[in-house]
């Protein structure tokens, strides 16, 4: 279903579960040392918008390329945050670097019907 969304332009939710791990930039962060979490992404491919969990902020979708949906690709002098969905593999990654601390979230995603964006967001 996720792959079909890329081809025909759909909106859908993704319920993603995985492991969160944090530590100094440059050191290995083994999955077995991480903590479990679940996040819900709401993605509107046609409208090129997305949000997560309570949808406090609806953001523009960064790009769709080579079988990937890049939700966010932000870089500044203090760090970066890149959130990528790999539809064919039903996987996602969310990597944040804040100063000298890296936080990695990764796991699997299951598609659900699109629940829309809150009315109070653009």
What kind of feature is each model-predicted range?
Residues 2-11, 30, 40-45, 71, ...:
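Classical cleavable N-terminal Sec signal peptides
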């Amino acid at each position: 279903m996720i792959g079909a969304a890329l081809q025909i332009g759909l909106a859908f939710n993704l319920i993603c579960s995985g492991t969160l791990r944090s530590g100094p930039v440059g050191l290995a962060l083994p999955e077995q040392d991480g903590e479990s979490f679940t996040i819900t992404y709401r993605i509107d491919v046609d409208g090129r918008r997305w949000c997560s969990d309570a949808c406090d902020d609806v953001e523009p979708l960064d790009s769709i390329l080579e079988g990937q949906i890049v939700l966010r690709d932000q870089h500044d002098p203090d760090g970066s945050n890149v959130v990528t969905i790999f539809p064919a593999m039903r996987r996602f990654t969310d990597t944040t670097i804040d100063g000298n601390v890296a936080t990695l979230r990764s796991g699997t995603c299951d598609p659900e019907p699109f629940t829309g964006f809150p009315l109070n967001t653009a």
